[in-house]
Amino acid sequence: MLAKRLSSILPPLTLEEALDTTKIHSIAGILSPGQALVTRRPFRAPHHTASDAGLLGGTAHPLPGEISIAHNGVLFLDELPEFKRSVLETMRQPLEEGQVTISRAAGTVTYPADFMLVAAMNPSPDGKMPAQSQCSPREIQRYLGKISGPLLDRIDMHVEVPLVPFREIAATASSESSQSIRARVIASRQIQHQRFQNHKQITHNASMPPRLLKEHCSLSREPFELLKKAMEDLHLSARAYDRILKVARTIADLTDSASISSEHLAEAIQYRSLDRQLWS
C-alpha cells in the first residue's frame, strides 16, 4: 500500500516529463486508445518472475522494459530477493545513470530510466523476524544475501517496518492526507529547482553530482562529527556517504531549513539500516 500511495504525493509531471514518458509508452505500445499524453506519474510493479528483457528491455527489436516504462515515476519490486540476481545486478547502472542501454543484433538503443525504486522484502524466507523464524541462520543469511552490497548502496533509504499492534490497526485517529504531504513535497522541489537553476541536467537533490555536495550539503562541526562517527562505526561506503548527505539535504528542505542540522543528519543515517548487520 505504501508503494502504491507514493506516486500520489509526488509533484505533477512537468510538460517535458510528460512528453518523455509519453514517447516511451508509445514505443512500448501501452498507450490507451485515444490517449495523446501521459499526465500521471507511472507506477509499475512487475512480478518477481520477470525476465531480464521484461525488466530492462529487449526482444529482437529493443523495446523499453519496466524500468524505462517507469521513467519519471515509481518502480515497485515486491519480494525483492525472489527476483533473479542477474536481473537485480544489471539494474545497478540504470540506478546510477538514469538510463539503460540495450544491445541486440538489430542495433543498440539507449532509453531513459530515471525512476524511483521502491522495494520490499521479508526478514526471512518464511516472512517472520529471525527470532521467531523456523529457518536456520544459514538459510536466513542466504536469503538476505541475494541482495548485493553494491545494489543496497544505490538504494537511498532503508526502512524497517515493525509489526503493527492491533490497537493501532483498529484506531480511528486521522492521519495526514496525501494532499497535505504532496504540498510539502512540491514546496521542497521548488527549493531544489531554485538551487539547481544554473544546472539544467539536475532537477532534484538525488541527481546532485559529487562536485556539488560540498557546496549544497556543507556541515557544521556537530553534524560533521556525527557523520564521521557513523561512517566509522557502521563501516559505510563512499556511496552511502553521498546518499546520506543527499537525504539529509532533502529532509532539511522539507522543513524549509537552509542548513543541515544534526537532527536532519541523524534521520538520514538511520535510513541506512541494511548497511548494518541485518535484523540482528
Give names to the regions the model predicted.
Residues 1-32, 97:
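Walker A/P-loop
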Residues 25, 34-37, 86-87:
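Inter-lobe coupling/hinge segments of SF2-like helicase ATPases
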Residues 31-45, 185, 199:
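Long, charged amphipathic helices and adjacent flexible linkers at domain junctions
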Residues 37-42, 47-75, 108:
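Conserved alpha-helical scaffold flanking the Walker A/P-loop in AAA+ ATPase domains
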Residues 75-76, 82-83, 166:
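Residues immediately C-terminal
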